[in-house]
Amino acid sequence: MAAGIGSRFGGGIKQLASVDDSGHIIMDYSIHDAIAAGFNKIVFIIRKDIEKDFREVIGNRIEAVCAQKGVEVGYCFQSLTDIPGSLPEGRTKPWGTGQAVLAAKELIDGPFAVINADDYYGKSVYTSIHDYLCQDHPDNAFCMAGFILKNTLSKNG
């Protein structure tokens, strides 16, 4: 998911901020780890207004890498118009994870994992989730990667 508006970030598109000298962003690492774990489809859930920048910073590069590895790439757009029912007056922000998954409903046709574009989870998480998703489970079975809070916070919280 990369449709957040980054209102606390302080400028630019948070999901597209470089984290190293080579211009990689957190999603580069996440996608690499997911593919290595066995995931074979990447769906970017973004806002329509960042599509051009998104494709320039990461989309085109990831599409090329995925094409070499036989991994499918899709795009969908999170929008306030995708909300069933009516919006509270003045609402300007997307509704978060649930609404993001709803925006991707046409591209999801089996078990899937959802990540935030600006969080790094680590290689083992993708392997654990992929292994779980490849097992037989009842239709109403779900999983979540859990973390020990003190191991996830910086000195600044």
Summary of predicted features, one role per range:
Residues 63-111:
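Short phosphate-binding loop-to-helix
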Residues 1-63, 110:
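N-terminal glycine-rich phosphate-binding loop and ensuing alpha1 helix
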Residues 26-30, 99-103, 128:
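Well-ordered alpha-helical segments embedded in enzymatic catalytic cores
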Residues 44, 75, 114, 144-145:
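Structural beta-sheet core signal
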Residues 109-120:
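Short beta-strand-to-loop acidic/aromatic patch adjacent to the donor-nucleotide binding site
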Residues 6, 120-122:
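A short, conserved beta-strand element in the Rossmann-like catalytic core
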Residues 27, 104, 118, 148:
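Residue-level signal for inorganic ion chemistry
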